[in-house]
Amino acid sequence: ENNETDHRSAFPFHGGTAKALERLRLYFWENKKLSYYKNTRNGLIGSDYSSKFSPWLANGSISSKMIYWEIKRYEKSIQKNQSTYWLIFELIWRDYFKYISLKHGNKIFKIGGILEKDYHWDASYSVFENWCEGNTSEPFVNANMIELKQTGWMSNRGRQNVASFFSKELKMDWRIGAAYFESMLLDYDVHSNYGNWMYISGVGNDPRDRKFDIRWQAQRYDSNSKFQNLWLENTLF
């Protein structure tokens, strides 16, 4: 078995509280990337486009409270701006899904979600397999799915797009996609995972019931196709 980290990885993760605190120090105090979080958080390539705290939060190596107070210290000594606001917002969003789980219990695992929607969903194994393997009609989806398979990581922007494609375009039972994420993600958290999948799939808390335009998203967030080329390079020949 090859345990080497893929050289393309945006997040060569190492577990434990010591590594979590090291990441906090680097992202906040040494590189001061927190000051630019709002502008970079939808990035796709590189280790510093987002905070990458989620795996350590998921396994308890660091707490939201610890990160929150470190942000407050940063705001006092370095800078308070929209970026510091947005990182706090994301911590609150994460806790919000925990409260959704507490309120609704096992409904988060039901096909109709917390809204108890009666939609028709498919469950084709071949469609699911092609999605997992990055073999769909959308290169942007494929690149993100290959990144997940190779590294256990996917950007927030990527997760929204592949989930929307799975549930809204392929009409597949969203829980199948959520379960695959559960099996693959370094930062799997039951509340965030199933909460976000419900949200994207139209059976959760989003009142707009949106469907992502995958090609528009790719053009906006990967306009030069750098991310797609990075992960699809081995599938072009």
Briefly describe each language-model feature range.
Residues 7-11, 15-19, 38-237:
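C-terminal catalytic domain of photolyase/cryptochrome flavoproteins
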Residues 1-35:
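Long hydrophobic alpha-helical segments that form multi-pass transmembrane helix bundles
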